[in-house]
């Protein structure tokens, strides 16, 4: 069971920071149609503070798993043209950018944007965006080489 707040876990030998939460751009549509929606979908200020305290206590992580990504990683090419981006609440992405700037990590994985993508390497760091079709082998992801592709790390 994963906590619904920032938390640190050990997955095998990998120290992992988990950070839930993201803004739903289709929130109004969900409300109008009585579809499921989580009012507390984003972290509160106090929950964000928990994450800040965790990276002070554990400044080095092997892996970060988050629902959305730091603001600088956003896949702008995947933004839905029908939604006015100026109305999208970016607090989570800005917060994750703050975490990313202060944390020493090897790998970062997230979903939210409904696509699969490996990002270009940044020093020894690799970033992975996944949707729901693929399952990544954690050991392959954590030990991948610059020449590996997304297909090389699929379970």
Residue ranges and their predicted role:
Residues 10, 87, 97-102, 114-155:
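Binuclear metal-dependent phosphoesterase catalytic core
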Residues 17, 107-109, 129:
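Hydrophobic/aromatic beta-strand patches that form the interior of the parallel beta-sheet core
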Residues 5-7, 21, 133-135:
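Residues that form or immediately flank small-molecule/cofactor binding pockets and catalytic motifs
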Residues 9, 24-27, 70-75, 99, ...:
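Active-site environment of divalent metal-dependent phosphoester hydrolases
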Residues 11-90:
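Active-site-proximal loop/helix segment associated with metal-binding centers of metalloenzymes
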Residues 6, 51-55, 92-100:
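Short amphipathic alpha-helical segments and helix-helix/interface helices
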Residues 4-5, 19, 66-67, 110-112:
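Short His-Asn-centered micro-motif
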Residues 1-12:
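Metallo-beta-lactamase
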């Amino acid at each position: 069971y994963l906590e619904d707040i920032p938390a640190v876990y050990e997955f095998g030998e990998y120290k992992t920071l988990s950070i839930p939460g993201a803004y739903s751009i289709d929130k109004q549509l969900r409300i109008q149609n009585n579809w499921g929606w989580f009012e507390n979908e984003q972290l509160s200020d106090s929950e964000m503070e928990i994450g800040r305290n965790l990276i002070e206590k554990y400044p080095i992580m092997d892996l970060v798993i988050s629902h959305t990504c730091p603001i600088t990683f956003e896949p702008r090419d995947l933004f839905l043209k029908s939604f006015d981006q100026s109305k999208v609440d970016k607090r989570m992405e800005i917060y994750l950018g703050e975490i990313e700037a202060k944390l020493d990590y090897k790998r970062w994985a997230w979903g939210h944007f409904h696509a699969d993508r490996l990002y270009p390497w940044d020093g020894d760091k690799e970033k992975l965006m996944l949707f729901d079709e693929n399952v990544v082998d954690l050991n392959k992801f954590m030990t991948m080489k610059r020449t590996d592709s997304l297909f090389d790390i699929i379970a």
